[in-house]
Amino acid sequence: MSVAVRVIPCLDVDAGRVVKGVNFADLRDAGDPVELARRYDAEGADELTFLDVTASSGSRETTYDVVRRTAEQVFIPLTVGGGVRSVADVEKLLRAGADKVGVNTAAIARPELIGEIAHRFGAQVLVLSVDARRTLPGEPTTASGFEVTTHGGRRGTGLDAVEWAARAAELGAGEILLNSMDADGTKAGFDLEMLTEVRARVTVPLVASGGAGAVGHFPPAVAAGADAVLAASVFHFGQLTVGEVKDALRAAGSAVR
């Protein structure tokens, strides 16, 4: 039997509140993270992802208190990211109740951090978050046409997103969270081309993120190679439930829990 596709609500947290915007801007309050986490657990979410969206750009540490309170209330795996810069940061988050930790900007600056975390805690703990966008006409391009960005998509790195995902997996990342900055918050669907290209280069689990707006957007992401599908605003604002997404995946022939 094939491995079940995971459905993962994402909680973008700013100053202890869940927020959602378009392309990480114009943030709108979406509620209390602990309450939302409990709701998604009850709805049958397979995991939760918690991202401190101010931690990297504002150079603030992730809010351990919110992680701790969330972990006390939910019993599904919790991935936490945002502002993770060191092995010590990972250890603090795991002690607070995280099951997996997302690393992004710090790994770009110092790729060996991936191996250090994987060696200390195991590859299964480490999720590499890749915020990628398509290069525009007239801009310097990458081999795949997808560039890794930082600071909520506001800063290009010149790194090819497909190459970076492949390299990170080789260095020890246990999972790739691939977030399309072009699609983020638009509700226009996942970037299927980018998913397909990354899937061709990595064997570790791949999480599709950015662009979910309708129940019909999820099965094509799985067909493009995603092992898990992540969404935020469609869940937070009640447009879709986790169960509806699982029904659509099941109808398309995917195994779900």
UniProtKB/Swiss-Prot annotation:
Oligomeric form and interacting partners: Heterodimer of HisH and HisF.
Keywords: Amino-acid biosynthesis, Cytoplasm, Histidine biosynthesis, Lyase
Pathway: Amino-acid biosynthesis; L-histidine biosynthesis; L-histidine from 5-phospho-alpha-D-ribose 1-diphosphate: step 5/9
PANTHER family in the cross-refs: IMIDAZOLE GLYCEROL PHOSPHATE SYNTHASE HISHF, IMIDAZOLE GLYCEROL PHOSPHATE SYNTHASE SUBUNIT HISF/H IGP SYNTHASE SUBUNIT HISF/H
Enzyme class: lyase
Descriptive protein name: Imidazole glycerol phosphate synthase subunit HisF
Annotated source species: Kineococcus radiotolerans (strain ATCC BAA-149 / DSM 14245 / SRS30216)
Domain of life: Bacteria
Locations listed in the record: Cytoplasm
Protein role: IGPS catalyzes the conversion of PRFAR and glutamine to IGP, AICAR and glutamate. The HisF subunit catalyzes the cyclization activity that produces IGP and AICAR from PRFAR using the ammonia provided by the HisH subunit.
Family in the record: Belongs to the HisA/HisF family.
CDD domains tied to this protein: HisF
GO molecular function: imidazoleglycerol-phosphate synthase activity; lyase activity
GO biological process: L-histidine biosynthetic process
